[in-house]
Amino acid sequence: MASDHQTQAGKPQPLNPKIIIFEQENFQGHSHELNGPCPNLKETGVEKAGSVLVQAGPWVGYEQANCKGEQFVFEKGEYPRWDSWTSSRRTDSLSSLRPIKVDSQEHKIILYENPNFTGKKMEIIDDDVPSFHAHGYQEKVSSVRVQSGTWVGYQYPGYRGLQYLLEKGDYKDSSDFGAPHPQVQSVRRIRDMQWHQRGAFHPTN
């Protein structure tokens, strides 16, 4: 077991999370900066999220207050209007947000056909899968075991449809990760911050 000093010296530390919410599209109008969880965006004085700028992430946003409803994963970058952060195009409502903890360089996830980790399964290690069908997995996804890393699952192939944040842990039923139906057809890793060049960490030469 490495000591705290060794752990801190052995890998770069993430920057503090930072996201800016603008009331209007294209980063116009009244704005508010967040550095931590926000259970109700309206309490910050922002009536409606028209655009989002993520300066250090990743984050997850929710359709409803108190982190409920449809989920939206935000990684470092610009989101000039609502349809740039929703892959379902079902709602333009963004009411609460929280930072996502990315604490592992390795990624391993197991998806199961039935609840309680039974039935046919598909194991994914350190890879993004845009289509489960192309990998020969035709089944529904009713339970998930995330052994390492942080992932986002999608309702449809090609990273489309409803998004489901999958953090380390066990999800015995699809409702545990917020899915109305046991339908997940693509999945990708969240590799932001210190381990991915797209993230907020910039190594020194």
Swiss-Prot record:
Pfam families: Crystall (PF00030). Signal peptide: none annotated. It comes from the Eukaryota. The modification N-acetylalanine is found at residue 2. Residues 17-56, 57-101, 107-148, 149-191 form the Beta/gamma crystallin 'Greek key' domain. One of its GO terms (molecular function) is structural constituent of eye lens. One of its GO terms (biological process) is visual perception. InterPro entries: Beta/Gamma-Crystallin, Beta/gamma_crystallin, G_crystallin-like. Keywords: Acetylation, Eye lens protein, Repeat. Residues 102-106 are annotated as: Connecting peptide. Residues 2-16 are annotated as: N-terminal arm. Residues 193-205 are annotated as: C-terminal arm. Has a two-domain beta-structure, folded into four very similar Greek key motifs. Homo/heterodimer, or complexes of higher-order. The structure of beta-crystallin oligomers seems to be stabilized through interactions between the N-terminal arms. Belongs to the beta/gamma-crystallin family. Crystallins are the dominant structural components of the vertebrate eye lens. This is Beta-crystallin B2.
